[in-house]
UniProtKB/Swiss-Prot annotation:
Keywords: Cell inner membrane, Cell membrane, Lipid biosynthesis, Lipid metabolism, Membrane, Phospholipid biosynthesis, Phospholipid metabolism, Transferase, Transmembrane, Transmembrane helix. GO terms for biological process: phospholipid biosynthetic process. GO terms for molecular function: acyl-phosphate glycerol-3-phosphate acyltransferase activity. It is an enzyme of class 2 (transferase). This is Glycerol-3-phosphate acyltransferase. Belongs to the PlsY family.
Length: 199
């Protein structure tokens, strides 16, 4: 019963579509703008840096909170794993948007910070560096998640396995991006330019 309850609570927390709701304040339907993805990067491009970065943070927080709470209450990797996976699945497949959500990067990052803060900072450092150098957010996200997963193994092998699972799920969600990266047709995102132009 605990597994089901934890899964449901975590799922519905993760399913809150901040990256859809906040752009709506500017009358922007994120599903019909840019890539159509209900995630922080598309919100950043479509609604500007302020709303975009707030969406990224909130998409992380909605996974961070349930995972941290349940990890403190139960102190058991099984409960923690259920909470983590379902929080990310809620973001990826939100019932409120007919199960069409994001790619799980920010929510997975929220899990990193909840269970292994240094892993969260590893992701951020990698993500920022690669995004600034290549302007490919998808590449930065994928590499960043696996870098965080690698670091996790040095602190807690169970977390390492969990993070690797979540990273793989997000990688699968990035299949079209990966194809475009291979074909050199992936859209670039100049963070500095966006901030200067629309800040």
């Amino acid at each position: 019963m605990n597994y089901i309850l934890i899964g449901l609570i975590s799922y519905f927390c993760g399913a809150i579509p901040f990256s859809y709701l906040l752009p709506k304040l500017r009358k922007i339907d994120i599903r019909r703008t840019g890539s159509g993805n209900v995630g922080g990067t598309n919100a950043l491009r479509a609604a500007g840096p302020v709303i975009g970065f707030i969406c990224m943070v909130l998409d992380g927080v909605k996974a961070f909170v349930p995972v941290l709470v349940f990890s403190l209450i139960f102190k058991d990797i099984h409960y923690t794993g259920i909470s983590s996976i379902f929080a990310v699945l809620g973001h990826d497949f939100p019932v409120f948007l007919r199960f069409k959500g994001g790619k799980g990067v920010a929510s997975t990052t929220g899990v990193f910070f909840a269970l292994c803060p240094i892993c969260g900072f590893t992701f951020l450092a990698t993500w920022i560096s690669i995004t600034l150098l290549t302007k490919y957010v998808s590449l930065a996200s994928i590499v960043g998640m696996y870098a965080a997963s690698f670091v996790a193994f040095f602190f807690n092998k169970d977390y390492g396995v969990l993070f690797l699972l979540l990273s793989t799920l997000s990688t699968l969600r990035h299949s079209e991006n990966i194809e475009r990266l291979v074909n050199k047709s992936e859209r670039k995102t100049d963070l500095i330019k966006i901030i200067k132009k629309r800040g």
